[in-house]
């Protein structure tokens, strides 16, 4: 199990700068059962790119950073729940996603730029501090933002991707040693010539409908069962789902698919192409610790944690995060924790965010 957690830490390995910007435009989005007027978009010039932010509420700022393949929309339930609890909630389309710009250069997606985007949001909104919550790829972005700017980020919530400090081994080399000539999606994302995004861009609906499933969802047999990379790409290795889970409606699917039909997948895949670069950029950080109150949340059946228990996760993270207050594992919940268990997630978040430091 320790090797699984170390492999997870390989994936996400920060220091940066940002530009202050003005609000250019505000519009609204129809969220079905949520009133359209409840959610507004802001378009801000931040750190050299235009970013789209979904915003709700007034009060202390909470910044929500999504992962792959997601958008601001993955936080739709938290926007409503946290804003009603008295928080100003911002959920950006991260760099390369949705309505946010997608620079062409791969190194524009390294951890320096990603954390600079988070600081840039605070500066553009005139906010001195915020709590930051990150899921999937948003977890390391949130983690490193809090690691380098504890005076700006007063609380940290890590979702799905544990943090146990910088590892000694080059993460990409570690994955190559483990998987060799077998398929592994992170190595696939690091292949040259954009092979991964070319596959995904052909059919965004196929990817999203296959990924956004619950543990135990019924699927047909995958078209590719050979573990060798030479047997093919990613999507044929995932069985066709029999339907959508209750927490992800056809309208949700249409919205998320539309975001990727518009932006493409290259921006999100470029995060993975910076894993080795991020590891090199953070070479002097081995002994740095996160010094803000921190909470970890995941589904007990999230494949990222590989079946790790609450105690194992606490033990693996406590040295790098001395102020880790609690590890929360929701039973029988998978990777998309804030969407699969929105009420439970909101309850835990609100309680943690309301605590005095």
Q: Could you describe each region identified by the protein language model?
A:
Residues 57, 125-128, 356:
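Glycine-rich phosphate-binding loop signature in dinucleotide/nucleotide-binding domains
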């Amino acid at each position: 199990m320790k090797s699984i957690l170390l492999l997870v830490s390989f994936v996400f390995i920060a220091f940066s700068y940002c530009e202050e910007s003005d609000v250019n435009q505000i519009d609204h989005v129809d969220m079905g059962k949520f009133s359209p007027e409840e959610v507004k978009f802001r378009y801000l010039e931040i750190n050299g790119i235009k970013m789209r932010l979904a915003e709700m509420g007034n009060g202390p700022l909470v910044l929500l950073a999504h992962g792959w393949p997601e958008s601001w929309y993955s936080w739709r339930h938290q926007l409503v729940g946290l804003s009603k609890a008295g928080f100003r909630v911002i959920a950006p389309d991260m760099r390369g996603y949705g309505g946010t710009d997608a620079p062409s250069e791969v190194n524009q997606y390294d951890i320096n730029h990603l954390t600079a985007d988070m600081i840039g949001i605070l500066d553009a909104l005139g906010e001195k501090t915020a709590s930051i919550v990150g899921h999937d790829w948003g977890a390391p972005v949130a983690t490193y933002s809090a690691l380098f700017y504890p005076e700006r980020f007063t609380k940290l919530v890590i979702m799905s991707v544990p943090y146990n400090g910088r590892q000694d081994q080059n993460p990409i080399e570690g994955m190559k040693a483990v998987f060799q000539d077998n398929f592994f999606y992170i190595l696939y994302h690091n292949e040259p010539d954009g092979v991964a995004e070319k596959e995904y861009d052909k059919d965004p609906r196929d990817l999203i409908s296959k990924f956004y499933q619950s543990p135990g969802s019924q699927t047909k047999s995958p078209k590719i069962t050979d573990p060798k990379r030479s047997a093919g790409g990613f999507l044929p290795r995932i069985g066709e789902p029999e339907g959508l889970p209750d927490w992800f409606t056809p309208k949700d699917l249409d919205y998320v698919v539309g975001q990727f039909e518009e932006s493409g997948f290259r921006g999100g895949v470029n995060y993975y192409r910076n894993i080795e670069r991020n590891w090199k950029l953070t070479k002097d950080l081995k002994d740095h610790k996160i010094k803000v109150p921190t909470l970890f949340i995941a589904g007990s059946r999230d494949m990222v944690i590989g079946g790790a228990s609450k105690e194992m996760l606490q033990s693996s993270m406590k040295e790098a995060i001395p102020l880790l207050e609690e590890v929360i594992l929701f039973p029988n919940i998978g990777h998309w924790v804030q969407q699969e268990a929105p009420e439970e997630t909101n309850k835990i978040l609100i309680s943690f965010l309301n605590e005095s430091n």
